[in-house]
Amino acid sequence: MKRTVYFLVGGTLMYSPSLLKAQKITPEKKIVKDIESVQVQGKSNYNTVNISRKKLDFIQSNTLGETLSKIPGIQNSGYGPNSGAPVIRSLSGNRVKILENGTAVNDLSGISPDFNTDIEMNNVQNITVYKNSASVLYGGKAIGGALDIETDYIVRQLPDKKFNVKGLLEGGSNSGQKQAFSAKGVIAKNWVWTVGASNQKQEMVRIPGKSKDSRCYDPNLVGFNSILQSLCQIDVNSRRVLNKSLFPYISQFAKDHMIEYELSEDDLYTFSSTYYNPADGKYYPNPKNDLYVPGQDAVKDRYKSEVNGIKDYVETKDGVIPNSHSESNSFYVGTSYIGKSLYVGGAYQNSYSYFGVPGYAIPKIPKHSHGKPQPKIEYSPINIRSLSHKAMFESGYKFTHFPISSIKLNYMGVFSKNAELLDRYRANQFAINQHNSRLEITQQKLRFLTGTTGLEVQYRDMEGTGGQKYLPNTISREIGVFTMQHLDFNIIQFDLGYRNDHVQRRAEADNKYVRSRGLSGGKLSDRDFTLHQFHSSAQWTLFKKGYLKVQYNHSERAPEVNELYSGNNHFAILTEENGDDRLDKETANTVEIGGGLNLKNFRVSASWYNTSYKNYIYLAHTGISREIFLVKEWRSDDTEINGIEAEASYKADLGKIGKWEIGGYYDLVRNISVADSSIRKWSDGDYMPNMPTSRFGFSLEGNVQNFSMNVSLDHYLKQKYLGKNINPELPMPAFSLLNVRLAYKDNSLGIGDLEYYIIGNNLLNTEARLQNSQLKFLSPLPGINISAGVKITI
């Protein structure tokens, strides 16, 4: 019974190493216990990282991307302080699948980066991160990895007590305030109920200096760089003027006849020491130019840039990220029946969020004035408002004396409205009707063979409204069948997996949808894709002290609806976004080699990976701009991604002064264009722009009786591998982030436990700008924050 319950707990239980592989774990006698840390599961068929609730207490932030950015190989997309998606090995959005208890959530970050992932972090119990392709398990949208987030809406095992309550109160100097509670109890012998709610609000986010990068005001950089002007959201009054200091002489003839012959400065300044007088047919000396500076190039230096003024779209205030407000709340209720071999549960969750993006746009592009005075352009702040309803169902059954070990069924229905606002005006809104279901069948172990086979069905209806709608109404259907088999020969283990997916994309344009003048999705053709996913890996265990492994993945991804059908001004990214309904599926072949050692209390691991993409889909510059919008098109070319990751840690039991763990890491990723395309080299360069930079970091955690401490220091290096935005990409300065958490547990009340804690974020108060953030010129990371809170468990 105990094994059955544990099997049913995980949202992705078929991939749990202790069950899928039935591995024998022999604990070392001198291993220090009671310190929970992020552990790379070397004996898993996938390169996974498991993050416990205890670890989340230290690293949890406002967004999922910022929370997971403390993990090697993962960074934050950083679309302002209130929106951030995980970036795994330079990939995010439509290439990183986010799941809740094994079922896909409503994630629109791949369609528009200002949307947040629909996850309530206070209800997360555990996160499993797949840093390599997980497409066999979860389909093509996991071509770059996946996150499986375990929440507590549905109870899967009977609680120890008939009534349990958890509460949280927290306030911070630069993180606002939040409250949360959850409760569960036993209704009858086998029935359990759950209920919970949370609330969060913050007025503004403070920073150590100015919100915009100082280079936004450098006339030598922004004077004639329209793309950088757009990224900085500035108006520049600039012009090209004749370089008078280039010419050694002034034409006397031009001075005498300037008005008569309607001459210009180009005629006035000359390289000739004499001029011809047609009145008498003689040559006379020209006067010298007092402004003349010798040594200049007659062609390159003929004209010079003159910047007369730089003005922000909207004036910013020092020490504050503009439009950085946020508020959110959620509520859930659920019930479960838990029997000896069967459990069935259902839950409902409602969530609301409203937050600002540190950028501005205009509701309507001004028309040409035809010589009349141009009216003043009024820019409005970009805000995001989301309302989501989720219905969840989960059931599992454990067999005995039967070829099938267990069967599990998950369903999630999502009904949401996700609006992009200009101030309070609804510019664009997506109404989502999404249904996902997943069936997993795990077979009984046959000597050295275990495995799981499953079926997954997904449906999404996305309807758009608003004056700045940039996508037609779309419908997506996906169905996939997969199997993952594990062969265990003790010191050598193998994994083999295959998945077949069928994907449909449909666009339904109506009369209210006005397309741009660009490609704008072509003919909005119906598209059908057949995808094949394959995984294989081998692992050699070395004297129970370490391992060597190699894995190969073949993954395929169907283009998303925005890549196929977008066709209008997407104000949130200040781009006229043009999809291409002719795009082919994306194909990736990945090889990863890794190894690790576990010597008593010392652990070290490292891995190298290389992914070759065919038809890598990216949003490319065209070199054209219309009004304030850059014109971009979704294109595909061959790309290569490679990188390394390394970790090490040491645990020590120091007796009276506690149990401690010290660790360190390093990561590097490069996203390289290998296509023989002169257009891509011209527009985007040799490397993909906005690529995550390399990092290294150190951590210390431990506990002394009821006290615990966590410290982390992460250093982000200056990017060496730069792409282009037509013009060469600018690197962000290197920076370091120091975070600390101190906590004390008090169980003297007799009815439960209290935990008092203090958290310090960015304690160095560093101006930190993420190289991979699209808003890096507008917004740094938040400045120093000190939070204090209390948790109660009854």
Write out the residue ranges for each language-model feature.
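Gram-negative outer-membrane beta-barrel transporters
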Residues: 603, 608-613, 630-723
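N-terminal periplasmic accessory domains that precede
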Residues: 26, 64-67, 84-87, 99, ...
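Transmembrane beta-barrel wall of Gram-negative outer-membrane proteins
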Residues: 175-201, 212-354, 387-398, 483
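Flexible loop and strand-edge segments within Gram-negative outer membrane beta-barrel domains
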Residues: 24, 321-328, 343-407, 412-436, ...
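Outer-membrane beta-barrel signature, preferentially recognizing the C-terminal barrel domain
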Residues: 378-400, 522-541, 545-547, 554-613, ...
